[in-house]
């Protein structure tokens, strides 16, 4: 389930969705790509089974991300590929894999990507998610008040629980033309 919708900024009620899913025995993966760099996430309080995010969404490198998973679920999952560091012991008769997370880390890891991701997370932590969230909220209010007088402008994504994302359409204008104009200016 998506924590925060990228196009509208809607903050989905993941805590309630997780509780309902768990009531039926369904594990839940939370896509936190849009929420991780903007709002604090307590995976244990949410009772999320898995949480994922992309490195580039937290101002880090592309091609790397993170997966949180409950230990018992990760231990129950088989490795999906083979390679050096993930193997505890190998004989002609059998292969014994290391425990999680090592059993999912075949071959040479993306060391440069991991260092870059760590630096990006350190930066976010140094600025502070509350400060980032407050600044983004101020920018959203400023933009909305500045655009309020544009004839035919209609905001999209006005959920009560919402991140600082502003989507809109302008009556009589092609969306791509508006986006192209804004991109140039």
Residue ranges with predicted function:
Residues 1-185:
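Pyridoxal 5′-phosphate
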